[in-house]
Amino acid sequence: MIFIFISFLSLFFKWQRLMFILISLEFIVMSLFILFSGDLNEMMFFYFMCFSVVSSVLGMVVMVGNVKFYGSDLCLF
């Protein structure tokens, strides 16, 4: 439960930067993954795991796509 609280606080206070949004969403998915791992049956667990992997990959694609345009994601690399 502490991961959900920290990730929602991070999402609430640092919503202007794409990197922090992606990190917050990953922490939310990780905490939900830990929370629901014992309650879901095998098929729903597989679906949730695939959904979390696809959302992570799409988030990385969006971040790399934004890094091409310098400064559009408010990050300096």
Curated annotation (Swiss-Prot):
Record GO cellular component, one term: mitochondrial membrane
Subcellular location(s) per record: Mitochondrion membrane
Bilayer disposition of the protein: Multi-pass membrane protein
Catalytic activity: a ubiquinone + NADH + 5 H(+)(in) = a ubiquinol + NAD(+) + 4 H(+)(out)
Transmembrane segments: 18-38, 44-64
UniProt key word Mitochondrion: yes
Keyword terms, alphabetized: Electron transport, Membrane, Mitochondrion, NAD, Respiratory chain, Translocase, Transmembrane, Transmembrane helix, Transport, Ubiquinone
Assigned EC number: 7.1.1.2
Family per similarity comment: Belongs to the complex I subunit 4L family.
Function description: Core subunit of the mitochondrial membrane respiratory chain NADH dehydrogenase (Complex I) that is believed to belong to the minimal assembly required for catalysis. Complex I functions in the transfer of electrons from NADH to the respiratory chain. The immediate electron acceptor for the enzyme is believed to be ubiquinone.
Protein name: NADH-ubiquinone oxidoreductase chain 4L
Gene: ND4L
